[in-house]
């Protein structure tokens, strides 16, 4: 069972595997497959005329972010995930990528990727705060956000534009203030800020300006988050922001 790029006709099977593995909605999958998916950035294994394992990646300049790695439940324990990942590593290296990135969803996966040569880098801080005196926010279009984000990122950070930004902009809002930049997603009364760059002390005022009682923020920090595997450049990046989680 060798990994191959999927055909367009296999997209329904890819979606079925994804939903079974991660529980995402059809709306989320519609957004991904409409804005971020390319058969050339996916490898899968077919067994008994069904997709048994698959993984995707986003191009992030010198790096590739490997995303949504999944194996069908009845095919687990056969090493298919490892086979797909190894094939992706080889392909990305041939394509000239400096390294690849994953964001494990749990500690067992962090150990699994560690055995494949991945190491923690950068880090995040995540916290929830209540609203305080509001600050001024300015709504941004995606292109302006991307340009401004480059000025806020730490040196040697992973730049996530192209299909990354196209995907993100379908379900997120972008704002800037005097000394900060943020991305916001909302679901009912829940407000999630998957990235706040700049002044983290502005978070309570941002929460008020977003007209919610509380909000959860993710900023650069020290807690384990992304992992890096070198494909030629040993030194990892300093920061990775959007896991699309």
What are these regions (language model features)?
Residues 1-14, 135-147:
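A short beta-loop-alpha structural element at the N-terminal edge
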């Amino acid at each position: 069972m060798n990994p191959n790029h999927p055909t367009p006709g296999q997209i329904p099977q890819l979606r079925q595997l994804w939903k079974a593995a991660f529980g995402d909605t059809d709306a989320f999958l519609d957004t991904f497959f409409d804005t971020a998916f390319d058969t050339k950035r996916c490898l899968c294994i077919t067994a008994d005329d069904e997709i048994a394992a698959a993984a995707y990646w986003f191009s992030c300049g010198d790096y590739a972010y490997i995303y949504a790695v999944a194996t069908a439940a009845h095919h687990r324990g056969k090493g298919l995930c490892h086979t797909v990942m190894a094939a992706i590593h080889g392909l990305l290296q041939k394509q000239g990528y400096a390294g690849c990135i994953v964001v494990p969803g749990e500690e067992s996966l962090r150990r699994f990727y560690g055995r494949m040569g991945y190491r923690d880098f950068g880090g995040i801080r995540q916290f929830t705060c209540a609203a305080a005196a509001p600050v001024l926010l300015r709504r941004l279009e995606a292109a302006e956000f991307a340009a401004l984000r480059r000025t806020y990122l730490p040196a040697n950070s992973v730049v996530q534009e192209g299909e990354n930004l196209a995907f993100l902009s379908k379900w997120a809002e972008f704002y800037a203030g005097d000394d900060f930049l943020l991305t916001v997603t909302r679901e009912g009364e829940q407000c999630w800020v998957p990235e706040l760059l700049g002044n983290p002390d502005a978070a309570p005022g941002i929460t008020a300006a977003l007209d919610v009682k509380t909000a959860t923020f993710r900023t650069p920090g020290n807690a384990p988050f992304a992992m890096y595997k070198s494909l030629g450049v040993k030194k990892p990046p300093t920061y990775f922001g959007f896991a699309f989680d």
